[in-house]
Amino acid sequence: MTILTTLIKEDNHFQDLNQVFGQANTLVTGLSPSAKVTMIAEKYAQSNQQLLLITNNLYQADKLETDLLQFIDAEELYKYPVQDIMTEEFSTQSPQLMSERIRTLTALAQGKKGLFIVPLNGLKKWLTPVEMWQNHQMTLRVGEDIDVDQFLNKLVNMGYKRESVVSHIGEFSLRGGIIDIFPLIGEPIRIELFDTEIDSIRDFDVETQRSKDNIEEVDITTASDYIITEEVIRHLKEELKTAYENTRPKIDKSVRNDLKETYESFKLFESTYFDHQILRRLVAFMYETPSTIIEYFQKDAIIAVDEFNRIKETEESLTVESDSFISNIIESGNGFIGQSFIKYDDFETLIEGYPVTYFSLFATTMPIKLNHIIKFSCKPVQQFYGQYDIMRSEFQRYVNQNYHIVVLVETETKVERMQAMLSEMHIPSITKLHRSMSSGQAVIIEGSLSEGFELPDMGLVVITERELFKSKQKKQRKRTKAISNAEKIKSYQDLNVGDYIVHVHHGVGRYLGVETLEVGQTHRDYIKLQYKGTDQLFVPVDQMDQVQKYVASEDKTPKLNKLGGSEWKKTKAKVQQSVEDIAEELIDLYKEREMAEGYQYGEDTAEQTTFELDFPYELTPDQAKSIDEIKDDMQKSRPMDRLLCGDVGYGKTEVAVRAAFKAVMEGKQVAFLVPTTILAQQHYETLIERMQDFPVEIQLMSRFRTPKEIKQTKEGLKTGFVDIVVGTHKLLSKDIQYKDLGLLIVDEEQRFGVRHKERIKTLKHNVDVLTLTATPIPRTLHMSMLGVRDLSVIETPPENRFPVQTYVLEQNMSFIKEALERELSRDGQVFYLYNKVQSIYEKREQLQMLMPDANIAVAHGQMTERDLEETMLSFINNEYDILVTTTIIETGVDVPNANTLIIEDADRFGLSQLYQLRGRVGRSSRIGYAYFLHPANKVLTETAEDRLQAIKEFTELGSGFKIAMRDLNIRGAGNLLGKQQHGFIDTVGFDLYSQMLEEAVNEKRGIKEPESEVPEVEVDLNLDAYLPTEYIANEQAKIEIYKKLRKTETFDQIIDIKDELIDRFNDYPVEVARLLDIVEIKVHALHSGITLIKDKGKIIDIHLSVKATENIDGEVLFKATQPLGRTMKVGVQNNAMTITLTKQNQWLDSLKFLVKCIEESMRISDEA
């Protein structure tokens, strides 16, 4: 974009502005948003100061940020995102927005140069006093001394929470001399201390808990946007007590008890750990002198204000909203007199003392003394929308007027296409710039602004894809993610005390933890399991692979089995029979398909390439891979039968559309079968829009079509006039005949009835079939189906999908009103989820009184199908603002303009349901909001509380996400394998089921499980060899290490585990050293055919297998073991060698030496 800034920089108008910008109060008029951004960016580039850009709200801030990223390095661009809504202070904060705020405050506190975009609400918000914030900026360097207690104390002040193992953002742990911290910004880090000196700093992977790279120094940012010290708590207690005593007599008696509960709920008086998320609502009482963000800026900062009058309007409504919000919470006993979140001074007062540059599109009167007014003449660019003739005449006009023409396109390939298009129009153009650009020609560069603009006085026009092709999307340069990807789904196999487990031989029990028991004078660790009644089972940790976590649907509580009973055997036999049946069915289908002859497509045509280049978005890697897999299938002679899985909005439709286009290009017809009329309509519109420039005849068959239209479509399918038909089950009626059907696309097959599924089966005969589903298919199942069912998976979301901001809060009409107003004010729509059909119309009336001007519709499952469809369609077409609905919206409806979801009684829903419902919003380029409400002052059941806690962690990462994924995976398995399998999965747990299925499939395919070459080794030594709780306190970590030890087969693995133990837990004690010795002995034994090493008190018995006895070179062994002298005796029993070792001092070392010698004495067999 340097060409643009160069042209601007040389212009006299800009130079006039540059002289007074930041020097005196100036009004700049006439500039469109993108032109204004270009000027501000150039001013920033030329100065060494901080620049503050104030907008009226966050939406505006986001828009300007996207354009500014084209000119300013992301490292120097900061935003202070505060929602335009009070409710935010009362709900769980989204870590994304919080980390952005912290990044901004930290940069300001450190005096960094940057361009800072702050919405009005952010400017007025009460913040931690600047000095306190500065005192809590920490940089740690290797070699420095730290006071550990003081350091840990500071972390707590900064909002970090102490845990035994760090797995989430905002946590820290202390183990021995190792401190782990997971900051809000950047990688998790591990600090190793030598007494009080920092010996090393490393970043580590949360997934594996292993260190990665050494670093010399690290900045630790706060984990909350408020600092809470002991002093702050002391001050807060006094202020809150006064506020409580002041409020109590002034409110209605009926709510005084509620006020008392609110007051006590902050637990200020008995707790030592304070939840920053909750205390933030008391910010007005926290600090003696709180700051606002303006106090964080340098004194010479440059200030630019975007649309002053709009800011004043927002300020007015903000003040009114804030007042009514505070008085509402006071009247309902949820707040105190004196509570506030923003400074009430006028906007102008806040920025007093700074020379300000005001940008306004139109000349306007302002109550401010202005020193300069600079007027620009700026015009919008005509929208061409791909109309070639208009485009040519406009470009010709620019050339004739000697304009500098800058054309911005979003990808490199489009640069070449654009140049070819201009040369067809005889417009001179260049794509590479050498020094200066002459006027009267176009320069085509990669870049993107929200809109084009024309500055006639400068002789400059900037044209973007939006004007050229009505491009829907504007690419944003990727911002560095504030939250690292280290928190991807951690295995949901983590065992917690109380979890249900499945023991392969004993069935379903409950995990009670790891216990160290003394058996025969030696200490060992055992996994303690609870079975039916009082039965308990202790499983030695070296047999832990027989125990799996029981994973089934969220609402299923399994029945505990009885130890020693026969019910588990019967259950397993039933499931075994069922998986064998399924395996057989799958294999038969697969063989039948392999034998079938279908149509073999050729390579992609030129039209296909053009069609694919027309797609306005960048494909995700998963989409591209899926498309390649589908095309490969189509180019084979056997018919395709592929299942494409991908979350809602991840771009499955585009993949299907490309397959459909390929089929049509070879003269084949395509049937696109969907479960609902609405989806049919949406897919139909997508196809029409994508294929408008190509000679493809597309028709729709659904209830929205007249009998006459349907008759014509049927006729067209028969004669071959219709290329693609989209429809509901109407497509399955027997009187439909295709001239040459080549591809059948089925969306969400599991939602069709049995009769329809049978009909789909007959249609599939010798035709390529692509089935789409939004329910994820589990990885393990995916693996066991390899070779019997073709699966493509889209797991990556499209770029620039904003994470949905999720709030969990108590039900309160003022919160609801505020959320509704906010969405409607940005011309959006709202899903209001209310799951009680009997009172849904009363709820609508209640909302209508709250929002008299809104159009509100109702949708629920007891309406007739036609009414429901018409309501949904009207909502999609923007005829209603709010849809009060039951969970009927859970599947398949796409309303890009609905970006707020409010769910009443969220505690009654399953997590996977909430996860899918939340996927309804945030599907366009706007931020989506989801409010999960739970009844105020209701005592929640433990499961509901856990569920809400999990939802709080929903922000794409935490355990809530894992549970939802787990539940959906099981649902996906049920869909793929048939409904009754769902029940079987629930009886034995998902993992055991997958394992049994995989074995059955392999057996039916004739794939033998590779027989283990190496026999099991039993090592039984009377030694204290275990992981003491003093060394590893966290049970999950303990189990994880035991699992690794159990799987160890090489010395490299042993060295790796030793490194890991020292890395994560510091130097290990003697019990752990012995445990590692035993594993080392086992590894030697594995490699040398030893089957048993048994401690018999004074001697140790070693048994070799017959095969190992044949392979051993006795001469080499005797020579090597001479140092052991008479302590070693050799014998033979049943053709197998036995060795006894008499115990002496250091006998463990002698044993290690002996097994090593046995391994080295093995003859290498020639068979290889």
Swiss-Prot record:
Domain Helicase C-terminal: 808-969
Annotated positions binding ATP: 646-653
Keywords, alphabetical: ATP-binding, Cytoplasm, DNA damage, DNA repair, DNA-binding, Helicase, Hydrolase, Nucleotide-binding
Keyword Iron: no
EC number: 3.6.4.-
Motif (DEEQ box): 747-750
A cellular-component GO term for this protein: cytoplasm
GO MF annotations in UniProt: ATP binding; damaged DNA binding; DNA helicase activity; hydrolase activity
GO BP, sorted A to Z: regulation of DNA-templated transcription; transcription-coupled nucleotide-excision repair, DNA damage recognition
Every Helicase ATP-binding domain range: 633-794
Compartment list: Cytoplasm
Family as reported in the entry's similarity comment: In the N-terminal section; belongs to the UvrB family.
Task of the protein: Couples transcription and DNA repair by recognizing RNA polymerase (RNAP) stalled at DNA lesions. Mediates ATP-dependent release of RNAP and its truncated transcript from the DNA, and recruitment of nucleotide excision repair machinery to the damaged site.
Name of the featured protein: Transcription-repair-coupling factor
The organism of origin for this protein: Staphylococcus aureus (strain N315)
